[in-house]
């Protein structure tokens, strides 16, 4: 027998998220207010990308390309883009490093060799240049890996520019018409100017 599940909805406009009660990790022994705070955000995140919940665990039916729209329209984040990996590993790794240096977590997605897809988070790096991937699943499989050695190496894509609208609005643009003029006497100095 198949059960017809009701359509899931959320009132994003009136939602208030209790960020103070969202620790890095929770479990069944966590205080109820923490469980409820994390559950509400997780539920709204799923609804925002039209995730399909089922009792057989075969997948979510959600698409990573829907995440930027959800972040912008439902969670007050600045416009961002899902970027498929179409560049060399060196360039891709530089994108990762830049985002992490700016303290921005990276939404990551890919498919396994068997074809199953998964979305996860890249949230750090170590002194060896390996990146920390959080796959979910209560920490199972998390660890530091080269970007080419992750569990979902095919059809890789990521969102590097995730930030709240308020932060984006207050972030200055890079200088335009930037010019570097070396000092005349071969000194180790330069004059920087921009308009």
Residue spans for each PLM region:
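Pro/Thr/Ser/Gly-rich low-complexity, intrinsically disordered linker/stalk tracts
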Residues: 165-194
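Generic structural motif
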Residues: 80-84, 157-158, 178-180
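Cys-His-centered catalytic/binding microenvironment captured across papain-like cysteine peptidases
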Residues: 101, 114-116, 125-172
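Short linear, low-complexity motifs centered on an aromatic residue
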Residues: 67-68, 72-74, 85, 92-97, ...
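Cysteine-nucleophile protease catalytic domains, especially the papain-like/related folds used
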Residues: 1-84
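Active-site-adjacent substructure of cysteine-protease-like catalytic cores
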Residues: 72-134
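Short, Φ-rich (hydrophobic/aromatic) sequence segments
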Residues: 33-57, 95-104, 151-163
């Amino acid at each position: 027998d198949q059960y017809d599940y009701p359509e899931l909805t959320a009132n994003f406009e009136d939602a208030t998220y209790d960020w103070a009660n969202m620790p890095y990790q929770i479990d069944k022994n966590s205080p109820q207010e923490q469980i409820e705070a994390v559950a509400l955000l997780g539920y709204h995140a799923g609804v925002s990308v039209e995730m399909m919940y089922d009792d057989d665990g075969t997948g979510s039916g959600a698409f990573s390309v829907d995440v930027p729209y959800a972040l912008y329209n439902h969670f007050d984040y600045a416009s961002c883009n899902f970027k498929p990996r179409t560049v060399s590993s060196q360039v891709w790794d530089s994108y990762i490093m830049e985002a992490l240096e700016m303290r921005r977590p990276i939404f990551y997605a890919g498919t396994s060799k068997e074809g199953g897809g998964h979305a996860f988070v890249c949230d750090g790096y170590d002194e060896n240049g390996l990146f920390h991937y959080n796959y979910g699943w209560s920490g199972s499989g998390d660890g530091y890996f080269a970007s080419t050695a992750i569990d979902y190496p095919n059809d890789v894509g990521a969102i590097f520019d995730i930030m709240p609208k308020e932060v984006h609005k207050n972030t200055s643009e890079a200088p335009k018409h930037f010019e570097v003029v070396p000092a005349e006497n071969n000194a180790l100095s330069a004059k920087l100017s921009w308009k």
